[in-house]
Amino acid sequence: MTTLALVDAGGANLGSVRYALERLGVEARIVRDGDGLCDAGRIILPGVGAAAPAMALLRERGLVEPLRAATVPLLGICLGMQLLFESSDEGDVACLGLLPGRVRKLRGGPGLRVPHMGWN
């Protein structure tokens, strides 16, 4: 069976994602350091929170380079998806750079409603 690594980037939804996977019959291992990604066949990077603290925690735990070097499928959820890009307007922070581009703040305008995302 392929090992699924669930990366702990300090996001509030780690437990929820793990529970959802368990309900689907998928066993996931929570990873808190770069060594935990060595034998992973799939990676999920969940997250609810802010980009700057999440990237700081990934750096502190030695996860940035292993995530960048990963050759297996990687799914980013919410903040995790934002962290896959080169940078983010939220905290003006450099991210993982796995996807080209910058996560930008949605701009409202006349007749254009912007959903509340927590940092607008």
Predicted ranges, named:
Residues 1-5:
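Extreme N-terminal starter segment of soluble prokaryotic enzymes
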Residues 9-12:
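Short polar catalytic/cofactor-binding loops
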Residues 17:
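Divalent-cation-assisted or electrostatically stabilized phosphate/pyrophosphate-binding catalytic cores
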Residues 27, 42, 73-75:
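Structural signature of beta-strand start/N-cap positions in the alpha/beta core
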Residues 29-39:
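Short acidic low-complexity segments
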Residues 44-46:
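Structural motif
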Residues 49-120:
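Cysteine-nucleophile active-site neighborhood
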